[in-house]
Every structure is written in structure tokens, then in C-alpha cells.
Amino acid sequence: MDLASRYKGVVGMVFGDNQSSNEDSYIQRLLDRISNGTLPDDRRTAIVELQSVVAESNAAQLAFGAAGFPVIVGILKDQRDDLEMVRGALETLLGALTPIDHARAQKTEVQAALMNSDLLSREAENITLLLSLLEEEDFYVRYYTLQILTALLMNSQNRLQEAILTTPRGITRLMDMLMDREVIRNEALLLLTHLTREAEEIQKIVVFEGAFEKIFSIIKEEGGSDGDVVVQDCLELLNNLLRSSSSNQILLRETMGFEPIISILKLRGITYKFTQQKTVNLLSALETINMLIMGRADTEPGKDSNKLANRTVLVQKKLLDYLLMLGVESQWAPVAVRCMTFKCIGDLIDGHPKNRDILASKVLGEDRQVEPALNSILRIILQTSSIQEFVAADYVFKTFCEKNTEGQTMLASTLIPQPHPTSRDHLEDDVHMSFGSMLLRGLCSGEADGDLETCCRAASILSHVVKDNLRCKEKALKIVLESPMPSMGTPEPLFQRIVRYLAVASSMKSKEKSSTLGKSYIQQIILKLLVTWTVDCPTAVQCFLDSRHHLTFLLELVTDPAATVCIRGLASILLGECVIYNKSIENGKDAFSVVDAVGQKMGLTSYFSKFEEMQNSFIFSPSKKPPQGYKPLTRTPTPSEAEINEVDEVDEMVKGNEDHPMLLSLFDASFIGLVKSLEGNIRERIVDVYSRPKSEVAVVPADLEQKSGENEKDYINRLKAFIEKQCSEIQNLLARNAALAEDVASSGRNEQSQGSEQRASTVMDKVQMESIRRELQETSQRLETVKAEKAKIESEASSNKNMAAKLEFDLKSLSDAYNSLEQANYHLEQEVKSLKGGESPMQFPDIEAIKEEVRKEAQKESEDELNDLLVCLGQEESKVEKLSAKLIELGVDVDKLLEDIGDESEAQAESEED
């Protein structure tokens, strides 16, 4: 009673004793009739009156809270047999815990329902008593009890959770209510949904009690995504159980599997009929899918095996097909559903090479209208009127190209320019257009009417294709686009065309400066492409600097006061890339020329300040980004369209920010990290270039070489003049660097903040000291080089003299040898003449005798061969005689046979002669 007395004292302090005395006395009389009445009907009438007055009056709720709870709790404990009294007591409790409608309550009144909830939940026995009532057979008793527990949960969540955990079979009783009548089931479902939020112990018990089976059973019974708000509550409860709980996800995957979740996404019946509740149900199911895909937020990237297993199993169960049907092929799906679908597709393939390959192989459409899924998503990006859908679909390509060199190369290989259409063709007219052709068509669209929205979106996709892939960057640099009107212009490289579009967007922005339609993002996205393209690509820098107008335009953009902080910062980064990735030695296009142009246009301090302004902007500063916590959808039969589409851009924006909030999604952590790393490299490189101005080309070897026909005296004089010229140039550079340092110092004094002042001073000191030190080193090196060259030339002159003497000696030796040869030749000619004149005739052999000897030898050999032939003929003749005798014995006419043989021989001889 001490607690009740103190509570009553608070009421008196708030409302005054006189104002609340009437309510207090009336409530007290009713409580006396209920607790001390002898007639049952009188007691029942009193509790009905108490119930009515408590439900309608805030003052009555306050008065009831002071003394009514002990009476009502006593009824629930001791009068269970009197069903009407128990019902009345529960309804009275519910009325005391339910806030009065704000339209009827005064704004100055204290929330009595909140105070009553606090008073009732302080005693854990009261919660245990209410949980025991769930086992009663009466429908209304169980129904009102669940409503009371829900009201307590809304106002005293922590106490109720602790009391339920300490009550034996507390969670079990609530889970049993899911199998009760529909009305009770729905109330129990709503109670469990609120109870399991951020309560890990309760989540484990609920899962152990078979929550997954019961949830999917209710969803199936209600008709899946076509069901009412009960399906939303089931999915909300499911999400509470799976969120940040790898063990529950593994249990679901290994027991029931993911098929029940995936089946919710299957469109049934009339596909274009999307009610608001169906939209909310689909969004809740997609949120479940997203939680399974993303895993725990505190897990290191690449080490969440549960996340990878979930992604693999989901794709094996054809989830990708359902997502593509819902997000791409279903033209009537709400924008919010399509956006969430694209996010799930992107998360599904993020860091999963196999899933990326499966997506790349998917085709959509029917019959002759079939095209790759990636082409269909690109078509949506270029055509959709929703910025949210563009951002979501762009995320698919971001995750597809991230660390996927083969995928990027595959997409870049299709970048083949098509002939410029004679009429304004729409992208949807040709489904057989390749990915690259469609992307190039999107990049070039809008040039005639100045609408660069499509070009901007295509530029975002191209930035993913060329990111961290030098091969794709070089491939894109070789693309040359035709002019829309050949008679009005010449073909130009794709890179320069995009720079020209950036200039067009800048001029359009300046013309529409007074317009209040939305925020800027076209220039930022094009600049993002150029920054990404130029990283580690000297060829792209050279292509950019091939036109002097590009550097001039970029300098104007950096100093343009009408441009946003983000635009000026990104333009400064692109300008810095033209320094750190510049490999040119051509005057006017080298790194020194770019740095010199920056110094003359704005000065180093002003240039570096653009980096600091950008890093402190809304887009690049993590501290200024809105927290992305979990926000459940409102449980109403008809959620508002604004809530479904999540159009909360005004809440996300900071006052004074000129950049579009959608850039928060497009400028992801990897790009912001790239910009920050480039900023540091640019600072170091610019200081280095200023410290060593044109050091690579200052000493020209050709000027140090002795010209032909130049004597040593003239050569030495020319070397002295060259050294004097170099010294003069060094002095000029030192004076110029001193002026720059003074400019940095004076600019640093005008900085408002002490931090900026220190940074400017640091840069100034570093530039000045480093430049002087480097210049002195360069001067000393150049003087040493000239001295070394002079010594080398003198050495070469001495060497040449020695060589000339040697050559003269060799020439004399050759002359002597030539004279010797002439003498030998003369002697030989004299010998020939003497031979021709008959002197000392030579003795020749007797040829006729030799011929006679040879003839005799040949005749002798012929006679020997003839004798051998005669011997052979004799032998053959004896064989013929023997054969003839044998034939005669056999009765053959030998003479006739020999004649025939002779005739045949003659005929054969004649034929050979012919």
C-alpha cells in the first residue's frame, strides 16, 4: 500500500486534490462495491461501471491506478469460477492500460496508461498470473489476457520480457496460442512479434518451441503474399528470429530449408494486381531473403561461411529466377518491390563468383524476344523514371563487376559503336541489341535536346565496367563515336565525348541556377566515371590533355562558385590525376605544365582547400550520414504509399546541402576510399613536381655534344653560355617558388579555423623547404654534369689524336704491302710473256702412241668377250638338241615349232622398228 499511496500522491500533485476528489471518490465507491458487495449482481454491475468510466476518462485511469489493481488482481486470483467477474476484471485492466484518444484527452494531461503499466509490471507475480490465464478454456479470457500483455509490452517491454523468462512455461503458453482460434492466434502472433525484438534468449526458446513450422503453416493458410496483415506479422516474427542469429539461420536451412520463404515470392493469379498489403508482404519476404544473404553485420568480410552457404543454397533453389521475374519481368510490381528485389540480386552475387556466372547466363523473355538478364536490367536503368530504381539496379552491376575481371572484360568486349540512327530510336525497339551497343546508345542519347539523364546513368554503369581493369579502360579509350550530324562535326573518342557532356551539364546547371527542381547529381556521376577511368591509366590522361580546352574547362569548374562542393572536389581530384598519372614529356601537356596552370589559376592553398571542403561535405563525411537502422513497416491494413516507397529524402538531407541524397548510395565506401587515397598522392606529387621543375628535360644531351666542325674553344664557350642559362632559369624558378610560398603563407593567414591554418602553413613550409633543397641539388648536379662532360670531351679529343696517329701508321703499312703486291704482279707477267715466246719449251707426251696402245687393249677385250659368247651359244645349242629329241619322243613336230618361233621373233622385231 505504500506504493499505492505514493502513486496517489503523485496524482494529487499533478491534478490538485480538489480536481481529482470527485473521480477518486467515485472510483473508490465502485471498488468498495466490488470487493465488499454481498450480492453477485451488484458486484457485476459495479465492475461494468468501473470498466466504462476507466475506458473513457484519463482522470479515472489515474484514480484506478492508485487503489484498483489490488482489487482486480484479487478477483483474478480468487474468483476464477465467476466467469463474468473475471471477464470484467480483464476488460477493466485493459482499459486502464490503454491510452485515451488524443483527440479527447487534453494535451496537458499525464499519460495515465503509461503510469498504470509501470505500476502493474513492477510485480512479477502479476505477469505470472496473467500467463496462467492463457490456459483457461474461455475464449474471451484468453483474448483479453493477450491484449493486456501486449499493452504492457508496449509500455514496459524490459520488465515483461524478464517476467516471462522467469515464469515456467511462459513462452510455451504463448506459442500454444498460435494454434488457437484465428483471433487469438493473431493477437498471440502480434505479442510474440514485439516480444522477440532484440531479445536473444526469448528468440532461442521460441525457435525451440517450433516457431518456424508454425509461422510457415500460418502463412500458407493465409495465402502467402496475397494474405492480409497476418502474413506481415508472421514475416516480421520470422525476421526477428533470423536477424543477427547465425544459429537460427543454420537451423532453418538444415531443417525446413528455404523453399517456404522462396515460395512467398512466387506470383500467383493476376500478376498485375498488387494491393498495398501484398506489397508490404513482398517487402517483408524480401527483407527475410536479404538477412539470409547478408549474414551478421559484425562479421569480417569473406569469413562468414554461413552467409556464403545461404547464398549458394538460395541460388540452387531457383531464387534468382523468382527475383528476376519480380524485379525485371513483372511490369506492374511497385517501385519499392523492384528496388528491394534488385538489392537482393546484388547482395546475392556480391563476392560469389559462381552466382555471378549464373546471373550472366540468365536470359529473360519468350520466343524471339529473349535477351540476357543483364541487358534487361541495363534497359531498366536507362528507361526508368524512378531514381530509386536506377540506384537499386545500378547496385547489381556494381556487385557484378566488383573484383570480376572476366565479367568486366565480357561486358567491355561488346562496346562496339553502332551507326548513328537516322531517327530517334527508342532502346526498347530492339531487344537483340548487345549490352555494349545499348550502353553506348545511352551515353550518346539526349545530346540533341540536352537531356543528359540517360547519359548520366550509362556513365555510372561504365564506371563499374572499367573500375580497376586496365584492359577495359584501354578498350574503351579506343572507341570512336560518330557525330550525330556528320556534316556538323568529326568523329571523336568516347572519353572526350564524355568530357564534352560534362561541360554541357555544367553550362545547363549554370543556366538553371534559379531552378529549385531537385538536387544536382549528373555532373557528379560523370566526374565519378572520369576519376575511376583515369586511375592508373596514363593513356586516359593523355587523351584528356590532347585538347587544351579540357584543362581550361576543368580549372574553371574547380573555381566555379556556382558548382557544389562535391563537384569542385571531384574536379580537383581529376585535375590531380592529370599530374600523378602523367607520363608525357611534351611541353604544355606534362605534369609540370598542369601544376603550373593550377598555381597560376588559383594557387596551391585554394586548390588543396577543395579537398578539405569535399571531405567535410554531406556525401563524403560518415558522421553526417543518416543512421541506417532497422525500421519495420507500420502494421496497418493500408500502409501509406510514402512509407512503402521509403521516400524520406528530406529527413536524410542536411540543411544547405546541394547534392542529391541518392549520391550516398552511388558513392560507396570503395569510391570514397579511392578519393581519399588519391588526395594524399596528389599532394605529395604536386610538392615533388614544384620542387623539381622539369628536371627530366632540363639537361638536353644534344646541347652538350660538340657540333661537327666546331673547334674546342667555341665548344667551351657554348658550354659556358649553356650553364649561365641554366643558372638563370634556376634563379627564376627559385624566385617563383618563393612567391608561391608567400602566396600560401598569406592565404594561410586568412584561414578561419586554426586547423586549416596549421595545414596551410605545413604545406607552405614543406613546399618552400623542399623546393629550395631540390633546386640546390639540381644546380650542383648540373654543374657536376657539365664538368664531367667537359672532361669526357677532352679525353675523347686526346683519344682521337692517338687514333689518328695509329691510322696514319696503318695507312703506311698498307701502302708498303701494296707496293710489294705490284712487284709480285710484274714478275708474274714477265714469266707469262716468256712462256708465250717459246723460251724453255715444255716436253709433251706422244699422243699417237697412246692412242695405238689404247686401241690394242680394246681389241683384246673384244676378242675375249666374243670367245665367251661363243661358249654360251654352244651350251645353248646342246640344250636345244636335247629338248628337240625329247619333243620328238613326245610326238611333237619340232621343225614346225621352230618356224613358228622364228615368225613370232620377226614380227616382234618389226613392231619394235615401227
Swiss-Prot record:
An example GO biological process term is:
post-embryonic development
**Alphabetized UniProt keyword annotations:** Coiled coil, Golgi apparatus, Phosphoprotein, Protein transport, Transport
Q: Which GO terms describe its cellular component?
A: cytosol; Golgi apparatus; Golgi membrane; Golgi stack
Phosphoserine, modified sites: 911
Cell compartment(s), UniProt: Golgi apparatus; Golgi apparatus, Golgi stack
Q: Which InterPro entries match?
A: ARM-like (IPR011989), ARM-type_fold (IPR016024), Uso1_p115_C (IPR006955), Vesicle_P115 (IPR024095), Vesicle_Uso1_P115_head (IPR006953)
Coiled-coil stretches: 723-837, 863-901
Q: Name one Pfam family in it.
A: Uso1_p115_head
Protein's UniProt name: Golgin candidate 6
Query: What organism is this sequence from?
Result: Arabidopsis thaliana
Q: Which gene encodes it?
A: GC6
